[in-house]
């Protein structure tokens, strides 16, 4: 997959960005370089290779030190929603921003 200058212009427009011609060309080169790298990675045969969770795990035995998941603060929903202009079913009600 590779993008064209038209694709970059369209994406910039959707993101409300104004890109100069040089910036657009630089973005095109960088993004197409990224896609080329992804295609190279996809081409590698990884059959029989165990997924890697952490790169250090390849050279030493590590165990992820995760804390116990426990409540540390009380539920303050009502206090936080006290000044909300609109609520519905216990949730903040906001205007629709995406059509």
From Swiss-Prot:
Q: Which Pfam families does the record associate with it? A: GatC (PF02686)
Q: Which reaction does it catalyse?
A: L-glutamyl-tRNA(Gln) + L-glutamine + ATP + H2O = L-glutaminyl-tRNA(Gln) + L-glutamate + ADP + phosphate + H(+); L-aspartyl-tRNA(Asn) + L-glutamine + ATP + H2O = L-asparaginyl-tRNA(Asn) + L-glutamate + ADP + phosphate + 2 H(+)
Write the Enzyme Commission number(s) for this entry. 6.3.5.-
| InterPro entries the record matches | Asp/Glu-ADT_sf_sub_c, GatC
- Name one molecular function that GO assigns to this entry: ATP binding
- EC class (word): ligase
**Keywords for this protein:** ATP-binding, Ligase, Nucleotide-binding, Protein biosynthesis
Entries under Gene3D superfamilies matching the protein: Glu-tRNAGln amidotransferase C subunit, N-terminal domain
Q: Name one GO biological process term.
A: regulation of translational fidelity
Protein purpose:
Allows the formation of correctly charged Asn-tRNA(Asn) or Gln-tRNA(Gln) through the transamidation of misacylated Asp-tRNA(Asn) or Glu-tRNA(Gln) in organisms which lack either or both of asparaginyl-tRNA or glutaminyl-tRNA synthetases. The reaction takes place in the presence of glutamine and ATP through an activated phospho-Asp-tRNA(Asn) or phospho-Glu-tRNA(Gln).
Q: How does it assemble?
A: Heterotrimer of A, B and C subunits.
Classification via NCBIfam families: gatC
| Similarity comment: family membership | Belongs to the GatC family.
Q: What is this protein called?
A: Aspartyl/glutamyl-tRNA(Asn/Gln) amidotransferase subunit C
User: Which species is this UniProt entry from?
Assistant: Albidiferax ferrireducens (strain ATCC BAA-621 / DSM 15236 / T118)
